[in-house]
């Protein structure tokens, strides 16, 4: 195993120039930081501790002292160039010089500049305050040829900074916090808002059926596989008051979507089947609700089935800290039947009671803000986003900013599809007019004007672009680095879906498929049809394209055929997971196993000139094949394992010898075969995984 010079320097806390100097002094020629050093050479030069000199120790101590005083500067706020040196003051004597020494040392402490992964040569130059040409010169000295627009790896960024005597941290820059919208709300401006309810629970426990009964609409029949594929927000009225429901999918593949739902909700309705009890996703939903700090109302569903046992369910809930009110606890528990409608009115009544206790209020006079619940690209209407308002009132014509998407609200629809002009807190609305499809779960707010919204959206897009470049760029450029990964394979995927919620669910599910041997890497994901750009990225990364409820464009099909890129389309998420697992098994190197083909006894040995020792054998079982391997066993111990050099019957070369026949066997590179030895013949077969 070998190490690179910069890895040795980092491991021993030495300067890379010192490492290069020591290696060259020991007669090991290395030219730059990327040069490799074999283990024997490493042990010879640096063995017996870290091999640091006293000067190196002193420099390390000083470096650690300076490290304590580091100042972190974002690349976006760094100075345009190197600081001007402060004019030195005349010394007033030795004592004065000694007093000023610590201050001088403090000034020497290098500032730490934070640089984003995937930064280009130009970006790094701007961050460090040096011309890009200087960066290129340093890289050329390291044996790397780069242009100003090419991205740099983390190692390259760190090495360039070290050459310049600067310190960098490579990591995503913090996204600017959303601007505060006005002063703190005054109590007289606060009004009661509809409670936002998230329905959670185990798959097939009847969440969507329960909402269907409440809404009097049929959602289940429209979902592929009968399972909710993305989040929808709806409102119902009960006793003149509105309640907003969010339906989160229940399968474990949708963990991330459920967690997002819990963040924007006021109350969680936990659906548990009376005949099934608490299941893994039920416990997961409880954890999400507790993490979000929201109250839980339990709906024990399917009380109409013959083997329903609500008391057992209550006992299981009590074991998990949700003691029902009927048992003297604080958890509201309502037995219901989505099929017959029993208990539905009682459930809605209890939800409103809990909402009153929570005192859910918001300021409708403030500029609107909230979260994107769902988004998609509609062929006829363009980007469509479902928003849930937490605060303020959204009007038609307002400029909305949501991550990388922005735009003026051209049209707004309520949960029934009716056009509306404004919407208040706790209300889900569907809007048109955005420049793109925002990610589900993104915070949105009303911007002052389109120019301000465009500027902030471009900043967010630039951050996203850098992250994509860092994720999909060529990370393994040399044969040594490829071999250094232990032969691990990588399955690169481009994921496209009809709605953002499905994209998130797919990414979450695919990430769980990664193993030590095969990594699943989503190089790009998005909403909308599969385009030629997606195909080219998949081709460049050696991956495939996954389309969920979307189809490739005609151009994309042509490009895919030309580039040899496979496009797979699905409408149920479980099919995606199953087929990707199968593809991963095909990528794994096949396992090997030995299969014994024959055994033979050595009854005599013959010395043949120019050939060596030949074993005269009697085949006791099986059939010897010329291409078999042979194992020599003496007194129960294997003394040699190798290839057959020759296989003869009398004086003729043969390809096989069956059981009960005699033959002569020559063994490659082995002449110590003796009478009485046992020869085991076998073949190595590959077992696909």
Swiss-Prot record:
The UniProt regions of compositional bias labelled Low complexity, in chain numbering, are 80-94
Species for this entry? Rubrobacter xylanophilus (strain DSM 9941 / JCM 11954 / NBRC 16129 / PRD-1)
The UniProt keywords, alphabetically, are: Cytoplasm, GTP-binding, Initiation factor, Nucleotide-binding, Protein biosynthesis
- Example GO molecular function term? GTPase activity
The family line of this record is:
Belongs to the TRAFAC class translation factor GTPase superfamily. Classic translation factor GTPase family. IF-2 subfamily.
Region of interest: G1:
201-208
| HAMAP family (UniProt xref) | IF_2_B
Spell out the protein name for this chain. Answer: Translation initiation factor IF-2
Q: Which Pfam families match?
A: EF-G_D2, GTP_EFTU, GTP_EFTU_D2, IF-2, IF2_N
- Keyword hit for Cytoplasm: yes
